[in-house]
Amino acid sequence: MKIAVGCDHIVTYEKIAVVDYLKSQGHKVIDCGTYDNVRTHYPIFGKKVGEAVASGKAELGVVICGTGVGITNAVNKVPGIRAALVRDMTSAIYSKEELNANVIGFGGKIIGGLLMNDIIDAFLAAEYKPTEENKKWIEKMDSLQHTNQDQNNPHFFDEFLEKWDRGEYHD
């Protein structure tokens, strides 16, 4: 599998470890940087990973910053990207199986490298399980990426809220 990986300067060593791990598992890696500890900005590298995945140059992506929050938010701004900030295998698997996530984000200063590798393995092994319900959710989320007059409609999510009120969702 071809995987794009990017980070900011705070977690360069963690990214290098992820790149090395992925290569050791037989994956091809597009290393989107950064490559050293010189001060930089996470949106640059979130965008690079997102563009690699959205364009099809990479099948999936991994982004890492100190907490994971900034770079995951940045990569989510790239049209066609559904990224999830994850800290456990359950969230990573859910993000792929239910939301068809194509990028996962980590807080490299929050989570250890061995756990990060396990979570990446779980994410890569998981497969999207399309249902009519999650297809609608994904379509709704994807529509938020573009200027869309429907977003100004106060009833944009009514269909889903009505189902909630009827008790159709079960956790």
Curated annotation (Swiss-Prot):
UniProt keyword annotations, A-Z: Isomerase, Lactose metabolism
Catalysis performed (reactions): aldehydo-D-galactose 6-phosphate = keto-D-tagatose 6-phosphate
Single GO MF annotation: galactose-6-phosphate isomerase activity
Pathway: Carbohydrate metabolism; D-galactose 6-phosphate degradation; D-tagatose 6-phosphate from D-galactose 6-phosphate: step 1/1
Keyword presence, Isomerase: yes
Enzyme Commission number(s): 5.3.1.26
GO BP: D-allose catabolic process; galactose catabolic process; lactose catabolic process via tagatose-6-phosphate; pentose-phosphate shunt, non-oxidative branch
SUPFAM superfamilies: Ribose/Galactose isomerase RpiB/AlsB (SSF89623)
Sequence similarity: Belongs to the LacAB/RpiB family.
NCBIfam families documented for this protein: PRK05571.1, PRK08622.1, rpiB_lacA_lacB
Subunit structure: Heteromultimeric protein consisting of LacA and LacB.
Name of the featured protein: Galactose-6-phosphate isomerase subunit LacB 2
Organism: Streptococcus pyogenes serotype M6 (strain ATCC BAA-946 / MGAS10394)
Gene name of the encoded protein: lacB2
